[in-house]
Amino acid sequence: MATSQRKILVTSALPYANGPIHLGHMLEYIQTDIWSRYQKLRGHECHYICADDAHGTPIMLKAQQLGMAPEEMIAQVNKEHQQDFADFNIAFDNYHSTHSEENRVLASDIYLKLRANGYIKSKSISQLFDPEKSMFLPDRFVKGTCPKCKSPDQYGDNCDACGATYSPTELINPKSAVSGATPVMKDTEHFFFDLPAFEDMLKEWTRSGALQTEMANKLDEWFEQGLQQWDITRDAPYFGFEIPDAPGKYFYVWLDAPIGYMGSFKNLCDKRPELSFDEFWAKDSKAEVYHFIGKDIVYFHSLFWPAMLHGSGYRQPNSVYAHGYVTVNGAKMSKSKGTFIKARTYLDHLDPEYLRYYYAAKLSSRIDDLDLNLEDFAQRVNSDLVGKLVNLASRTAGFITKRFDGKLAKIADTTLTDAFLAKQEQIAEFYETREYGKAMREIMALADIANGFVADAAPWQLVKQDDQQEVAHQVCSNALNLFRILVTYLKPVLPRLAQDVEAFFQQTLTWDGLGQDMAGHEIAPFKAMMQRVEFDKVEAMVADSKENLQATSEPEAPKGPLATDPISDTINFDDFAKIDLRIARIVKAEHVAEADKLLKLQLDIGGETRQVFAGIKSAYSPEDLEGKLTVMVANLAPRKMRFGMSEGMVLAAGPGGSDLWILEPHEGAQPGMRVK
């Protein structure tokens, strides 16, 4: 079915230019590349752009460690990044750097427009200063204990444990991440972006469908906490763009980083005069702009970025799509275990098409983490791509070449073809909505049908019978046409395989050509298109990824849950005694509208009923909970939430998601009993 042409600009988050690409990064670029390739396959004008994020103190310090100028280091890293992406068949239309003239001009332009419109404030602040290095400490170069949840070893801008944002001066027991020294306070003048002025606009935008439900719900929490003015200044020494009219003051990297999307597109427009920058970025633009990002940078892309664009007279993105993290074999990527795998190490051992397919098979439109289980990876690739897909052609193509002059027959019974073509709109919708896993399941279900057809018809038996030659010709031609349709459906995911299949069919695979009559079409001799995953190659990749641990007397690293969630700092008995734990019976449980993770619980604690909102929806349905006994914190200060008042906390174990288990006391415990 023909569709009207859309004008689309799509981006992936900019990789930081201080190190190599790894398989965690690759999830996002594969996800975006599939979506971009799908749009182009449908005939839309789609531009996929990206750049290296090349500014900030980490760049400056890494270059110093290497004995290089920052400009030299980021140029080298940029070259390495582009080679890794190219070898993974990531088809950027332009790849640039935030350390570019286009980006400097745009960053200054946006800042000056924000200042002229009254959205830039200036004030003197006290900032942490490293007395040993004689430098102000940016937020990521201060570590300490989170002021909100008290988790140790957190950065100075946000907490990885609870997601809270704060200023470096709010950290408990801060230390310089550069020297380890205890920082001192020193006054300096900084410029702030007036984010609270955009609260109404942001609330409207975040509920316009621009964000996934999980993201929109998270933003509601931030709105409840109140938006704060955003410090966009860093003091010299700093590698970045100097702020206009402010010598010695530089733009914070997160101001010019998202502007890098615009800078890269401006660079593309300068190379291709037929493209108009304003057509995509002007306030009244009718083109579409989409950002694919990781869930760790939602705050910047869903609050600061649209507000900056709005305040400086540019358009906002249509949508910001977030994805989760990559784990390997069910655990956080580990250098010691060899599961922190660099893109180049993977490429040294395995076909990039394997990973593209595996990620696609597990991706959805949600922000769930994705586990790269290496045994499942090998099994799924071998089963789906080799055993089902390519095998369909390898079992039938030779008969066409040897017995029928390499030409396909006119298919008399089009029942199977019609059934395959009937799935195109469903598969298209799955691609459009980023439900790649559903698309892969649909396509592989069709592959099963096609293979069943070939197995039942057994053309290898038919060709031995003189009176069955035409039937054999029909069967093999039908199978190859189904193979052509399947690979066309998979073309956004498997571009290299699609090229091989195009050479085999001697024609370009197009979405509009799915229903093409292939009668009389001549094919080329079949060549092997994909090899099985040999697990010893997977093991070799893991071995090459391991970093040798120094032979020291350090204690053995914790195993199990302690490996990723270490025991917190020691407290004394008096601290623990302040916590009043009580047995509670869940008398009622229900869903909370517009809350992705919460259930509303009514808890009987022996003569008193408490209402508690618990983040356990991913693990329990309300009907599973009613009547159960559990343990609650009874003297926790009530917290007013958008959905109502939460009067305590239930206790659960586990890392989160579906892996959560509420605590259940033994039989005999009664509501209201104290837990000691």
UniProtKB/Swiss-Prot annotation:
GO molecular function terms attached to this record: ATP binding; metal ion binding; methionine-tRNA ligase activity; tRNA binding
Principal localisation: cytoplasm
GO process annotations (BP): methionyl-tRNA aminoacylation
Binding site for ATP: 335
Family matches, as CDD domains: Anticodon_Ia_Met, MetRS_core, tRNA_bind_EcMetRS_like
Pfam families linked: Anticodon_3, tRNA-synt_1g, tRNA_bind
The keyword Lipoprotein is assigned to this record: no
GO cellular component, one term: cytosol
Residues that bind Zn(2+): 146, 149, 159, 162
Entry keyword DNA repair: no
Domain tRNA-binding, residue spans: 575-676
Subcellular location: Cytoplasm
Record EC number: 6.1.1.10
UniProt catalytic activity: tRNA(Met) + L-methionine + ATP = L-methionyl-tRNA(Met) + AMP + diphosphate
Cofactor dependency: Zn(2+)
Keyword annotations: Aminoacyl-tRNA synthetase, ATP-binding, Cytoplasm, Ligase, Metal-binding, Nucleotide-binding, Protein biosynthesis, RNA-binding, tRNA-binding, Zinc
Top-rank lineage group of the source organism: Bacteria
Cofactor, how bound (note): Binds 1 zinc ion per subunit.
PANTHER family, alphabetized: METHIONINE--TRNA LIGASE (PTHR45765), METHIONINE--TRNA LIGASE, CYTOPLASMIC (PTHR45765:SF1)
Stated role: Is required not only for elongation of protein synthesis but also for the initiation of all mRNA translation through initiator tRNA(fMet) aminoacylation.
Assembly notes: Homodimer.
Protein name (record): Methionine--tRNA ligase
Gene: metG
